């Protein structure tokens, strides 16, 4: 059974995912619609079965990383952004390393959220 804090956490996660769609520059309009549907689906699954949330989230992360790595325009845009960061005095990163680190960190965040949900008895 869900606790009130569980409902707040799950709702905040879903709203955060939907908010990120607005600022996602690497996706086409069709992909943004897909991400909205996926976010809503995740929100529903959070209420019904958290293990499905973990599987769906990790699958989405893997597919997103794969789509960036296989899209020449996405890689070029990411390369351009990384060059801007480096020109501003930031650390130099390659496209593949950036995607791998981002996917890894996001996956750890999902697993951490699931751990919190299990610990608090939400999941």
Residue ranges of predicted features:
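Short hydrophobic membrane-inserting alpha-helices and related fusion/pore-forming segments
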Residues: 1-7, 48-57, 108
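Lipid-exposed faces of alpha-helical membrane segments in multi-pass integral membrane proteins
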Residues: 8-15, 37-40, 59-62
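Short, amphipathic, aromatic/basic-enriched membrane-interface segments that mark the entry/exit
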Residues: 19-37
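Juxtamembrane boundary at the C-terminal end of a transmembrane helix
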Residues: 110-123
